[in-house]
């Protein structure tokens, strides 16, 4: 999946993956991570997610990474945040009081940038990758997460043959098989969200589960 795929989605505003409200599993389970309020939280492939605003409201300093420039600009504009921007290496660094975003390729993001984070939150990153790229993303995520750091992972699972992703189906078995090398994994919740997703209903997807996992870097 080439970067132009995502750039085209944002250019055409075909962003069904963007949620107009804070994720319900984030609201319910974030406190279980026991991350100090002032701790920095990393959000990979953050888009213009309102989840970042929620994390900031909890007192966290949010550090996002997003490929598409328009997504970053829309986030700050729509939330009326004053921001500065400077090019640093292969990325552009957007800075405001509580939400900083590195715009560029997450695969070239240096681990030193995230070395002081206290937590991380992945709702739309792991499920954005097809199988051919997902394992590479997991390896890069592991490089970016310091030992002992805890995070909340949110996934979707459904019969992949019924719908062309993204979002791609990520099963509990896949999570255990490919993430357990790097993380201790605890399943926090699994809920049926088919009724809330008309696109899946229209394609006759028989079931759609959203799961939340607590991850701890080994």
Curated annotation (Swiss-Prot):
GO terms for biological process: methylation; response to metal ion. It is an enzyme of class 2 (transferase). S-adenosyl-L-methionine binds at residues 10, 45, 66, 123. Gene3D superfamilies: Vaccinia Virus protein VP39. GO terms for cellular component: cytoplasm. GO terms for molecular function: thiopurine S-methyltransferase activity. Its main location: cytoplasm. Its EC number is 2.1.1.67. NCBIfam families: PRK13255.1, TMPT_Se_Te. HAMAP family: Thiopur_methtran. PANTHER family: THIOPURINE S-METHYLTRANSFERASE. This is Thiopurine S-methyltransferase.
């Amino acid at each position: 999946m080439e970067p132009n795929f995502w750039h085209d989605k944002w250019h055409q505003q075909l962003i069904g993956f963007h949620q107009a409200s804070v994720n319900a599993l984030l609201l319910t389970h974030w406190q279980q991570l026991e991350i100090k309020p002032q701790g920095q939280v990393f959000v990979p492939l953050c888009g213009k997610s309102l989840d970042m605003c929620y994390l900031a409201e909890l007192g966290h300093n949010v550090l996002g990474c997003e490929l598409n420039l328009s997504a970053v600009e829309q986030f700050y504009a729509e939330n009326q945040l004053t921001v500065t921007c400077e090019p640093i290496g292969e990325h552009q660094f957007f800075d405001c009081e509580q939400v900083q975003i590195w715009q560029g390729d997450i695969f070239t993001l240096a681990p030193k940038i995230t070395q002081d984070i206290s937590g991380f939150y992945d709702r739309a990153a792991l499920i954005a990758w097809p199988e051919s790229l997902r394992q590479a993303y997991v390896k890069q995520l592991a490089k970016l997460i310091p030992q002992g750091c805890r995070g909340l992972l949110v996934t979707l699972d459904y019969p992949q043959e019924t719908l062309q992703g993204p979002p791609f189906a990520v099963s509990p078995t896949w999570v255990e098989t490919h993430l357990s090398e790097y993380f201790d994994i605890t399943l926090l919740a699994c809920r049926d969200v088919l009724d809330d997703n008309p696109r899946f209903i229209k394609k006759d997807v028989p079931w759609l589960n959203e799961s939340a996992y607590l991850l701890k870097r080994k």
